[in-house]
Design a protein with these regions (language model features):
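Accessory, usually C-terminal, subdomains that scaffold auxiliary metal cofactors
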Residues: 7, 31, 39, 100, ...
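A charged helix-plus-loop insertion that forms the helical arch/lid used to bind
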Residues: 10, 14-25
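Single conserved hydrophobic/aromatic residue that forms the stacking wall/gate
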Residues: 1-13
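Small-residue (GG/TT-enriched) beta-loop-alpha framework at ligand/catalytic clefts
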Residues: 8, 27-126
Length: 183
């Protein structure tokens, strides 16, 4: 893209971001995955610090990593990936290879994760009996949620991750990054 067009696009994304969240222009970071943009902030001033301290370092949002690495997994039905972290669950929703949504929601109880899953299915008019749900993350929560969802969704299973991740308890994002670096 021409530098002027790129700058205009970045400003539009920053304006949209600031319509929901408050952040200084220089703190809003952007990742691009297959024509989609992920806008995010971390800590005020962090982006400038990282650019000064680690010039050329690639900084990515964990949601961007999930979208990029999971979009090519072929399933004949809509699919939802849920990565359960302490206090947060990441949801990535696809219809075929088309990304519908990538979002993180806070949770305190398993019912919160179920609520967010079924809310996403409702928003995108996806029949629970016609969806594939893949779970990863915290072992106990993942196993309990898998049992709870068995009667409600067509397919529910653990997300297949590289062997080292399952043996070491490595996060899904870290294991997907390792896999991509080896490829």
């Amino acid at each position: 893209l021409h530098p002027r067009v790129r700058r205009q696009r970045q400003m539009c994304i920053r304006d949209r971001y600031n319509a929901v969240y408050e952040a200084a222009e220089e703190d809003i970071m952007q990742d691009y995955v297959d024509g989609k943009v992920c806008a995010y902030t971390l800590v005020p001033g962090l982006q400038a610090f990282l650019q000064r301290t680690f010039p050329g370092a690639r900084i990515r949002c964990h949601q961007s990593v999930l979208v990029k690495r999971l979009c090519d997994r072929v399933v004949d039905m809509p699919r939802v990936y849920i990565d359960i972290r302490k206090g947060w669950a990441d949801f990535v929703v696809f219809d075929g290879t088309k990304l519908l949504m990538a979002v993180s929601h806070e949770w305190r109880a398993q019912e919160d994760i179920r609520y967010h899953l079924f809310n996403l299915l409702d928003v995108y008019d996806i029949d629970p009996k016609g969806v594939h749900v893949s779970l990863s993350g915290m072992r106990d929560e993942k196993n309990a949620l898998m049992q709870a969802l068995r009667g409600d969704v067509a397919y529910v299973m653990k997300t297949l991750v590289p062997g080292i991740a399952s043996k070491t308890g490595m996060s899904l994002v870290a294991s997907l990054l390792m896999r991509s670096e080896k490829a």
